[in-house]
Amino acid sequence: MTMSNFARFGAAAVVALFAMSPWVGTANADDPPKAEIDAMRKALSKYEDPYVAVRDLYLSTVGCVHYDGSTMEGHLQYAKGAMGVHFVNLTIQGPPDPLKPNVLIYEPVGNKLKLVAAEWLVPLAVAKERPSLLGQPFQGPMEGHEPLIPQGFHHYDLHAWLFKDNPLGMFSPTNPDVSCKDAQFSLMEMPTKLVAAP
C-alpha cells in the first residue's frame, strides 16, 4: 500500500468510526484535580514506548504537525509551536474517557519518538453541546485538520500535555517547546476553520 493510499484509508476510517460514536459532556473551565492528572499519566505511561501504542491499535499518521502562528479570521488561533506526530486509535468510541484518549502525540527526538501529549476528538455530528473533560471545554467546533483529517470531519478536540511541560498551558493545542526538526515528515498546517455549532 502506498503512503498516499495509506493516508486516504486512515483518514476515511477516522471519519467513519468517530461519526458513529455517541459523545457527551459539558463545558467548565475549572483546573483539573492533581490526582486525576496523576492517574492519567500513570495509565498512559506505558505508551512512552510507541511500539506498545501500536500493539494497542494506535496507528501513526506519520507527519509531525507544527504551526507558524499565522492568524486568519474565522479560524482557530494556534500559537507558534508544534503538536508532533499523532497516533490515532480508531477503536476508541463513546464519551471522552481521560484514561483512553483517541490520539497519542509524540515528539521526534533524534531517531526516537517521545510521548508528549494526548488528545480527545468529538464529532460535531453527535455532540449535543460543547464537550469537556476534567472541567476543560473542548476547542471548536472546527473542520478536519487537512491533510491528516478530511475537511468535512467537523469536530471538537482537546489536547493535554501530560508528558511535556507547555509554557502556554497544559490544554493549549500547540507547544512552543515541541519541535519537528528531527522528523522525517514535517507538516506545517494552517489554522483550522471554525464551523457553526448546531
Predicted regions and their residues:
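Short, Lys/Arg-enriched N-terminal segments with co-localized hydrophobic residues
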Residues: 1-2, 25
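Bacterial N-terminal signal peptides that target proteins for export
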Residues: 2-13
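Sec/Tat signal peptide C-region and signal peptidase I cleavage site
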Residues: 23-29
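Primary mode marks residue(s) on the alpha4-beta5-alpha5 output face of response regulator receiver
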Residues: 30-198
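Bacterial N-terminal signal peptides
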Residues: 12-22
